[in-house]
Amino acid sequence: MITDNIMTQIKRLIIIDGHAVLHRAFHALPPLTTQKGEQVNAIYGFLLVFFKALNEFRPDFAVATFDLPAPTFRHQEFKEYKAKRPKMADELAEQIPKIKNILTAFSVPIFEKE
């Protein structure tokens, strides 16, 4: 049947909103630290979500997106953009480069765009 043939040719892409998943994991999980004292709860939670998504959706491709550090054009256009949002916790900010390194090791492209 033609429909079955088309369905086998369709490729599946999964896009992970890196900052959103890390932020959610950071606040959802208790502080987890390595033997060196580095907090890794956001990394752990991110990887749980990431591997669950890979297992559930079986994508052909996966990419991750991350926000650029402020200020961006949104801050320039809208002075109130995220104005009331508290500063990101240092313990969370320190985990961002680490998860990017992990994703790079897994050959997952990372996109950051203003």
Describe each region flagged by the PLM.
Residues 4-5:
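Intrinsic-disorder-associated, low-complexity terminal segments enriched in Asp/Asn/His/Tyr and depleted
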Residues 8-114:
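Noncatalytic, basic helical substrate-engagement surface that gates or grips nucleic-acid strands
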